[in-house]
């Protein structure tokens, strides 16, 4: 019994809030199209989500993503990765932008580090129909 208690306590201590983190549902509006997604329970994601509703003028790039500058600079932007998964919503500290990645390409490696803050859970095919520049709004359902 002591071993079981120790194993549970040990797991909780090292797992912490990360293992039990909850995602928050987010609405992503592109013109008349409404998509669903989630925002992760991280310091950076929550810092950005505190600014919702947030409209970002985004540009399509490389047949794989939309990205655009945000009007504030988050403080919790440490780390990052040079790859993405389809559906990732990311923040890039290098150029202070949000991005939505929707399609792997023949060049899946990135030149700037991005930090995932959420993901689109709707069908990503919608992004292939959008124009070269779109106003994308992130908000929470009321």
Protein language model regions, located:
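Positively charged n-region of N-terminal signal peptides that target proteins for export
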Residues: 1-4
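Bacterial N-terminal signal peptides
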Residues: 7-16
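Boundary at the C-terminal end of the N-terminal hydrophobic targeting segment
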Residues: 19-21
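N-terminal secretory signal peptides
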Residues: 23-69
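Envelope-exposed proteins and targeting segments
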Residues: 24, 33, 96-98, 132-134
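Well-ordered alpha/beta subsegment
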Residues: 27, 112-142
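Mature extracytoplasmic domains of secretory-pathway proteins
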Residues: 51-96
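Beta-strand-rich cores of mature extracytoplasmic or soluble domains
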Residues: 93-120
């Amino acid at each position: 019994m002591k071993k079981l208690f120790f194993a549970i306590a040990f797991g909780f201590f090292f797992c912490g809030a990360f293992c039990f983190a909850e995602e928050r549902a987010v609405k992503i509006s592109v013109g008349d199209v409404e998509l669903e997604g989630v925002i992760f329970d991280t310091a950076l994601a929550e810092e950005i989500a505190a600014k919702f509703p947030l409209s970002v003028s985004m540009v399509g790039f490389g047949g794989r993503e939309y990205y655009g500058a945000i009007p504030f600079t988050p403080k919790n932007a440490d780390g990052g990765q040079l790859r993405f998964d389809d559906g990732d919503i990311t923040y890039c500290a290098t150029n202070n932008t949000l991005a939505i990645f929707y399609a792997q390409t023949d060049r899946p490696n990135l030149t700037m580090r991005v930090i995932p803050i959420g993901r689109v859970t709707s069908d990503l095919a919608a992004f292939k129909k959008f124009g070269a520049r779109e106003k994308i709004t992130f908000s929470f359902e009321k």
